[in-house]
């Protein structure tokens, strides 16, 4: 069974996604990240909040899992 979501800030999520090859391409209140994958541009938007609400964090995890395998993302977003 999965543990609950971690409490993360926007900056922490940006750092996590950077580890998977995403780079900041702009934004202040909402940070836009992009990487170039085998199917073209892969873009994510992360609110620059501290902390990010649980619902928003779930959505970011879900969107990121379109580009990065959930098994690799899970330890960064969830407590076990």
Language model: regions and residue ranges:
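A short, structured beta-strand/loop element
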Residues: 23-59
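C-terminal structural segments of small proteins and small subunits
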Residues: 51-80
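N-terminal first-folded block
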Residues: 1-26
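Generic detector of leucine side chains in alpha-helical contexts
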Residues: 5-8, 17, 33, 44, ...
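Short, flexible active-site loop motifs that bind/organize anionic cofactors or intermediates
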Residues: 3, 47, 63
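Ribonuclease/tRNase effector modules and their secretory precursors
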Residues: 1-4, 35-38, 71-80
């Amino acid at each position: 069974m999965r543990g609950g979501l971690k409490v993360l800030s926007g900056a922490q999520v940006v750092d996590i996604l950077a580890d998977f090859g995403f780079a900041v391409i702009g934004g202040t209140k909402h940070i836009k990240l992009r990487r170039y994958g085998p199917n073209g541009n892969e873009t994510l938007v992360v609110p620059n909040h501290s902390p990010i609400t649980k619902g928003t964090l779930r959505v970011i995890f879900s969107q990121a899992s379109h580009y990065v395998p959930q098994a690799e993302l899970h330890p960064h977003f969830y407590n076990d």
